[in-house]
């Protein structure tokens, strides 16, 4: 993949993150991009670990839907 495609992919992900609720975006960013554990995210956000898991699950679904709707198939 080319540098231009990589930049495009990053922009797609950035735009999809902006489409999430703030709490979902926070959980996704901390867990997947910063490698923070679910328990630590719960402590940081002040929400129960089970709720963090729900936000991660819902956020991932929304990201996948957004990216597919905008032409990203995972192979670009």
Language-model features: locations:
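Acidic, proline/glycine-rich intrinsically disordered inter-domain spacer in sigma factors
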Residues: 1-18
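C-terminal edge and immediately downstream basic/flexible tail or linker adjoining helix-turn-helix-like DNA-binding
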Residues: 15, 43-46, 61-76
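The N-cap/first-turn positions of alpha helices
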Residues: 23-24
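A short pre-motif secondary-structure segment
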Residues: 27-31
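Helix-turn-helix DNA-binding motif, specifically the short coil turn and the N-cap/start of the second
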Residues: 37, 46-51
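Residues within the DNA-recognition helix of helix-turn-helix
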Residues: 55-58
């Amino acid at each position: 993949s080319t540098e231009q495609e990589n930049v495009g992919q990053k922009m797609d992900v950035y735009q999809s993150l902006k489409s999430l609720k703030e709490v979902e975006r926070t959980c996704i960013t901390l867990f997947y991009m910063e490698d923070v554990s679910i328990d630590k995210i719960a402590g940081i956000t002040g929400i129960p670990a089970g709720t963090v898991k729900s936000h991660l699950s819902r956020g991932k679904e929304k990201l996948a839907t957004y990216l597919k709707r905008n032409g990203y198939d995972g192979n670009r």
